[in-house]
Curated annotation (Swiss-Prot):
Pathway: Carbohydrate metabolism; tricarboxylic acid cycle; oxaloacetate from (S)-malate (quinone route): step 1/1. It catalyses: (S)-malate + a quinone = a quinol + oxaloacetate. SUPFAM superfamilies: FAD/NAD(P)-binding domain. This is Probable malate:quinone oxidoreductase. NCBIfam families: mal_quin_oxido, PRK05257.2-1, PRK05257.2-3, PRK05257.3-2. One of its GO terms (biological process) is tricarboxylic acid cycle. The lineage of its organism: Bacteria, Bacillati, Cyanobacteriota, Cyanophyceae, Synechococcales. Its cofactor is FAD. Its EC number is 1.1.5.4. It comes from Prochlorococcus marinus (strain MIT 9301). Keywords: FAD, Flavoprotein, Oxidoreductase, Tricarboxylic acid cycle. One of its GO terms (molecular function) is L-malate dehydrogenase (quinone) activity.
Length: 498
């Protein structure tokens, strides 16, 4: 297809195309619409509604990630020193998300009641070694303004008052400890995605197409991409100056189709999940927190159990898990050939190397997949001793695709998220999983900063973003006073009183 001399008047041309209708694409769409309102862009989503795959309320493995209670974000190094850098980074990123929501809510643009509820976050451990670890973590983290309000207790009665289902039917002489942060949250990212896109759709320069899938993409000249898309069996071609690939696990397949040099070193490792869910009101009303345990030594990060209070479709539920498993699908609603189609000559050796190095992980995932209902409930009893199998049912969670990256040593399996950018800023892709949705605003700001839109107007656009997220605040994100000011502002707008 030849390029148009005046693409802005061409119905098949868009300044940007965002692939995927989940929290990542919707966050980027919101940012573009707010700071670049004249940009003509298209969002395409394979399913018939936004936020239905990885962003879906039951599909999202963890909500309200702020590193308050997730112990795998504060590991010990080889010398036994506690590392909290990742926890600090995640917490600051989550506060950035909170700041954007506060700005939009204050302006009357979104309704926080549809997606945000405050609820305590608790870390819970048993055994002297784990208690010592938790105490060390508490002491180190409370030195920082992000976690200054954290409480520690090894009192059975006090922990019982925080989370009664954790101590019911537990021997009172058992050595246990917990930390608690009252300013935790439960976020329904599916509902938030719908809020974002409802707002974005008011912009006359934005088009959203559901039941529309990316088939192929290629660079046709220095400034344009051609995308082949399919909607209910009908294929068409569109052109754009910028592409964002935010299609969850399928992003790796699309990134490979782009053939940008930066994509060559990547592969994907899919992980499935299942929840135990309780709807019984006499139990859901007794548990008002998110409680994270500690993974067994040598267990993978996705094995960390948590018992969450969640609000989904205006209903209060308890979710335990997710129990990880192995699959070759990259999305719940995709193909079992996803993994095999992602194997290319430039990543096959790194993927095989990861397979050999992580044989224990693969065996773990397979063993988790083979668990029956009773064995899953027995696992739940480690956190909730009074659990009764008849009160819980099983439901599939979403798919996660962990990053496999080529290294000098072969291949490396990464647990996290990573942005891949083309050298000219015309394409960006988001790979990976946790912490994901909770840090979407910070991640999408980075995506926007590396895009073609920042090439000629970086200073002005950066100011617009800062004014949107941090109005009346101007300082480094790493400055402790700035962090305190952000939390104070957000608490005031949301009506949260510590």
């Amino acid at each position: 297809m030849t390029s148009s001399k005046n693409p802005t008047n061409d119905n098949s041309y868009f300044d940007a195309v965002l692939v995927g209708g989940g929290i990542m694409s919707s966050t980027l769409a919101l940012l573009i619409s707010e700071v670049l309102p004249d940009i003509k862009f298209l969002i395409i989503e394979k399913l018939n509604a936004p936020g239905s795959e990885s962003t879906g309320a039951f599909n999202n493995a963890g909500t309200g990630h702020a590193a308050n209670c997730e112990l795998n974000y504060t590991p010990l190094d080889e010398k036994g020193n506690l590392k909290i850098d990742k926890a600090l980074s995640i917490n600051r990123s989550f506060e950035t998300s909170m700041s954007l929501w506060a700005s939009l809510y204050e302006a009357g643009k979104i309704d926080i009641k549809k997606f945000l509820k405050f609820i305590p976050h608790i870390s819970f451990v048993s055994g002297q070694d784990n208690i010592s670890f938790l105490k060390k973590r508490f002491q180190k983290m409370t030195e920082n303004p992000e976690f200054i309000d954290m409480e520690f207790s090894s009192s059975f009665d006090e922990i019982s008052s925080w989370a009664p289902l954790i101590t019911k039917d537990r021997n009172p002489s058992t050595q246990i400890a917990a930390t608690r942060i009252g300013r935790g949250t439960d976020i329904n990212f599916e509902a938030l995605t719908k809020e974002y896109l409802s707002l974005v759709s008011l912009n006359k320069n934005v088009e959203i197409r559901y039941k529309t899938e990316l088939v192929d993409l290629k660079k046709i000249d220095k400034k344009q991409w051609e995308l082949e898309i399919s909607s209910e069996g009908r294929k068409t071609s569109i052109r754009t100056g910028y592409v964002f690939l935010g299609a969850g696990g399928k992003t790796i397949n699309y990134l490979q189709k782009s053939k940008i040099p930066e994509a060559k070193s990547y592969g994907g490792f899919p992980v499935s999940g299942k929840w135990l869910i309780c709807e019984k009101k006499d139990l859901t009303e007794k548990h008002n927190s998110k409680v994270y345990g500690k993974a067994d030594i040598g267990s993978p990060p996705m094995s960390v159990p948590h018992l969450d209070t969640r609000w989904i479709d205006n209903k209060k539920l308890l979710l335990y898990g997710p129990f990880a498993g192995f699959t070759t699908k990259f999305l719940k609603q995709s193909s079992y050939f996803d993994l095999f189609s992602s194997i290319k000559k430039n990543n096959i050796f790194s993927m095989l190397d990861v397979g050999f190095k992580n044989n224990d992980l693969i065996n773990y995932l397979i063993s988790q997949s083979l668990k029956n209902h009773n064995s899953r409930v027995e696992n739940l009893k480690n956190m909730m001793p009074s659990a009764n199998s008849s009160d819980w049912y099983l439901k599939n969670a979403g798919q996660r695709v962990q990053i496999i990256k080529k290294t000098e040593a072969g291949g490396s399996l990464k647990f996290g998220t990573e942005i891949v950018n083309s050298s000219d800023g015309s394409l960006s892709a988001l790979l990976g999983a946790s912490p994901g949705a909770s840090t979407a605003v910070s991640i999408m700001v980075k995506v926007l900063e590396k895009s073609v839109f920042f090439l000629n107007d970086k200073h002005n656009l950066q100011k617009k973003i800062n004014d949107l997220i941090y109005p009346e605040l101007s300082d480094s994100e790493n400055n402790s006073t700035f962090i305190k000011d952000i939390k104070k502002r957000n608490n005031s707008i949301f009506g949260f009183h510590p």
